């Protein structure tokens, strides 16, 4: 017998501060709870379930949360265009799981399937238990500078701090990911043959 409950929630908000500055905040929640109940009657093969039957009960819960905030700038200065986004995000995941199996401990009364009927002993009962918490924190920035809609300079930078890096040399500084790219649209500067509808050169 299986049962699942799931909750999904998503929120977002945008605020246009000026004609060139926008603030944005987003958040997501995904929570799931699973329950598994397995019953093996005493008439089943003894090697599989023992003399009085076998009962397995598992509870699994996972909660994932994500949120980010960004400031976005979009502005034109004469022949130049500027498109910038700066922000931060957090990704959080919590997992809890417990699995109880009567196989090694046995049932006190045959074919009575509940936790109270399991003969709890050091050899059986809880054969799996998970309590895990993972978190990723990030800051990031992207910028594109354009000139006469024909040349573009793209810059990105991101720094991540992961809970898996705790007690390592990367715990405080995390990991930094920069990138630089340049794009050139020849058709904005040179008359192209009619059979060329679009051209682009890019280096990174």
Residue ranges and their predicted role:
Residues 1, 38-53, 96-126:
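Surface-exposed loop/turn segments flanking beta-strands in extracellular/periplasmic regions
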Residues 4-77, 81, 134-167, 171-188:
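Surface-exposed extracellular loop regions of Gram-negative outer-membrane beta-barrel proteins
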Residues 7, 117-138:
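Outer-membrane beta-barrel signature, preferentially recognizing the C-terminal barrel domain
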Residues 30, 88-96, 160-161:
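Short, internal active-site loops enriched in acidic
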Residues 89-93, 185, 204:
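Short glycine-rich beta-strand segments
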Residues 189-204:
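Outer-membrane beta-barrel translocator/channel fold
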């Amino acid at each position: 017998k299986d049962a699942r409950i799931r909750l999904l929630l998503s929120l977002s908000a945008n605020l246009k501060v000026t004609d060139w500055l926008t603030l944005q905040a987003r958040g997501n929640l995904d929570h799931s709870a699973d329950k598994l109940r397995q019953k093996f009657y005493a008439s089943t093969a003894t090697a599989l379930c023992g003399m009085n039957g076998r009962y397995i009960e598992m509870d699994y819960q996972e909660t994932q949360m994500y949120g980010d905030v960004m400031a976005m700038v979009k502005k034109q200065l004469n022949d130049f265009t500027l498109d910038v986004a700066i922000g931060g995000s957090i990704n959080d995941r919590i997992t809890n799981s417990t699995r109880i199996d009567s196989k090694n401990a046995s049932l006190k009364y045959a074919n009575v399937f509940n936790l109270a009927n399991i003969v709890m002993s050091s050899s059986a009962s809880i054969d799996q238990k998970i309590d895990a918490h993972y978190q990723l924190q990030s800051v990031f920035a992207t910028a594109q500078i354009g000139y006469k809609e024909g040349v573009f300079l793209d810059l990105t930078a991101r720094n991540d701090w992961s809970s898996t890096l705790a007690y390592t040399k990367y715990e405080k500084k995390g990991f930094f990911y920069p990138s630089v790219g340049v794009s050139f649209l020849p058709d904005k500067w040179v008359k192209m043959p009619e059979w060329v509808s679009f051209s682009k050169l890019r280096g990174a």
